[in-house]
């Protein structure tokens, strides 16, 4: 569920000019993996392996996600141009599962433009959209394309999954 906010955003036209399309994001991931790197500053073997697994996950989600008719109709009913900004990183497992689906949903409307921004390259943006004080991703910020007014946010994961994550974290169980 998207949390409605109706306020000005910290995201500027300069941020959007530097943001990526989903295709550019996927190409960046492939390029970095060819160099045994990932997004962000931690290029450890573990982070690169997470990124490699996530590239496979994204391909699977891209191929298997089918939007139901009700959702397509809802997206076609959008009346105003929007920009969906998604804060993400290639090594993030939650992002690998949800970003391709969010892009497919947005693509169902000709009035929605998707822009991806790397969390670690835009701390000033990420810090405006913390989840319980943390830099949790993916984070979707929905903007009115004409006014740049923030219409709502979503993320980092669906509410039931977020509650499970919080419960496991509270019980000190592994959440990685």
Residue ranges and their predicted role:
Residues 104-112:
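Short helix-loop-beta junction
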Residues 115-150, 161-172:
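Thioredoxin-like thiol-disulfide oxidoreductase module
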Residues 2-79:
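N-terminal leader/targeting and pre-domain segments
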Residues 175-176:
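Conserved small/polar residues in nucleotide/adenosyl-binding loops
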Residues 82, 110, 136-140:
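Generic beta-strand structural signal
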Residues 75-104:
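Local sequence-structure signature of Cys/Sec-based thiol-disulfide redox active-site neighborhoods
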């Amino acid at each position: 569920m998207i949390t409605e906010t109706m306020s000005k955003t910290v995201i500027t036209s300069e941020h959007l000019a530097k943001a990526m399309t989903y295709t550019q994001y996927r190409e960046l991931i492939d390029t970095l993996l060819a160099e045994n790197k990932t997004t962000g500053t931690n290029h450890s073997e573990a982070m690169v392996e997470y990124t490699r697994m996530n590239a496979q996950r994204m391909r699977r989600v891209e191929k298997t996600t089918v939007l139901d008719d009700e959702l397509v109709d809802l997206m076609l009913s959008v009346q105003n141009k929007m920009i969906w900004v998604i804060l993400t990183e290639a090594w993030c497992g939650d992002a690998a599962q949800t970003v391709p689906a969010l892009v497919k949903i947005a693509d169902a409307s000709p009035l929605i433009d998707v822009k991806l921004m790397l969390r670690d390259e835009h701390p000033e943006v990420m810090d405006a959209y913390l989840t319980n004080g943390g830099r949790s991703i993916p984070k979707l910020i929905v903007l009115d394309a004409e006014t740049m007014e923030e219409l709502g946010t979503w993320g980092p994961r669906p509410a039931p999954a977020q509650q499970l994550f919080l419960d496991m974290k509270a019980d000190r169980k592994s959440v990685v």
